[in-house]
Amino acid sequence: MDQSSYDVAIVGGGHNGLASACYLAKAGKKVVVVEALPQVGGMCTSGPLIPEAPNHTINPCALDLMSLRVHPMMIEELELERHGFVQKEMNPGYVYVHPNKDTLVFFRDYEKTADEIARYSTKDAEAYRKLMPVVFAFVDMALPQMRVDPASFNFKAKLASLLALMKNSGRKDEIMALVSSPAYTTIMERFEHPVVRSALCCLLGAAGPITNEATGIYFVLLGFIQKFGLGRAMGGMQTISDALASRLRELGGDILVNEPVAEIVSKNKKVSGIRLKSGKTISAAAVVASIHPKQAFEMVTEGEMDRGALTKVQLAPANAHGGSPIKIDLALSGQVNYHELEEKRGDGLSLRKSVLLIGTEEAVLDNFKCVGRGQVSKHPYMWITAPTAMDPSQAPKGQDVAYLYPVAMPLDPVEGWDAIREQVANQVIDWAAVYMKGLKELEIGRCMEVARDWEKRLNLHNGCVIHIDTCTTRSGGMRPAAGLGGDRLPVEGLFLGGAGIHPGGGVNGMPGRLAAARVKRYLP
């Protein structure tokens, strides 16, 4: 039997697994990353995925760089720019579009955004100016904790959060009301104009159902946008994963692709390595599972994982509301335009590089209600953009790629996806084409994936792109579940290192960085 030995084996070659490996290799550990697919990257990938358009680059999952700008440590500490990673800022990043073609722009400058709101309601603009300091105060309190291990004492982080709390002590009641209430309640309570309400519903709904309790934490998205801005990876999202892989090899780490893992080998509640489906075994003193916690625990040698712990991750919420985003990408023979929207604004602002948010307040609520019944709303709520507007290198000269992201689609439609896939794709494209002119006429080819496709292709439980749903009871040391968010698991030497642990989803490498720090404390 083919066998090799490492200090640490990383299961899963997504960007978190690669980041974890880089940090460990940088610390002098002998590391191997094992990936089931032909290329590394997981949900941080891009490439020519439409057969009819081999020169069009498709980003099948992640695209906008928000959390990477909030937590830029991976880029800086691992010197990824030296390995080819380049990002450019989008400003404005997000633009809400109302059915009557009115637009509301979320600028990076919150005062400028307030001025934009004043075009519709001076009262709402004033309400926005009063709300954002509360949001920023919460961000300032939360951010130090998001960047550290909840299993450690973190004196400096606690002090930073305490100082932020003291600085904003007069806003304590407002902060508590914000984060403990449904996001929708805050929107309805503070704002009156339908364009303003719809814009906020459309933005925050990307984090999940805005009518659920304690979803006021979704307002951090607004704080992040206006505090750190938005970016895009030039060349596509694969450049991030490729830069990490390049850095890992430079540090002496190994990468195996096309090698699905069959078992995380454990004896007497302590890992000894991994066994691949090919029959090869890899000995390791520690294993980082940069995959969904459910799959990780189920891979452990039968009888070795505590049944209670296994049950906790199996039942942890992953698209628990019955819905999930889907993705439709189109390769186009020309360029789409937003002339009608720009002309109605009349201020000369180009919207081509921005993400358009499509969906009224009523549509957002209806989409989330429909998914619970296994139905598709008549008016899909979606985010749409042309990545090639920011980066023309992702298509032949003068051509575009369209990225359509319906936010709330049923995980399992009543009719089944096989029966309605084409119908839904056409429905989404028809609706997007109302705002993205030329979309239908210029189509060369398309690709579409739903949550069950991601589950199959990426071994992603319930197709949940953030592994575990975002909520206050699944954050910090409670993520993925009570008793499992620390640096010790029921099987010694096993560490979780994906979006299912603190601080959660997003392309930022923070879970991988955290896992590496835990491994370094564990290994001699």
Residue ranges and their predicted role:
Residues 193-210, 374-385, 434, 438-502:
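A glycine-rich dinucleotide-binding beta-alpha-beta segment and adjacent secondary-structure elements
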Residues 99-213:
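Rossmann-like flavin
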Residues 262-395:
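Mid-domain catalytic core of redox enzymes
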Residues 1-8, 26-27, 475-488, 524:
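Extreme N-terminal leader/targeting segments of oxidoreductases
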Residues 2-147:
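N-terminal glycine-rich phosphate/pyrophosphate-binding loop and immediately adjacent elements
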Residues 222-271:
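Helical element adjacent to the flavin cofactor pocket in flavoenzyme catalytic cores
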Residues 499-520:
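A conserved FAD-binding loop/helix module that cradles the flavin
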Residues 266, 522-524:
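Active-site-proximal substrate-binding core of FAD-dependent oxidoreductases
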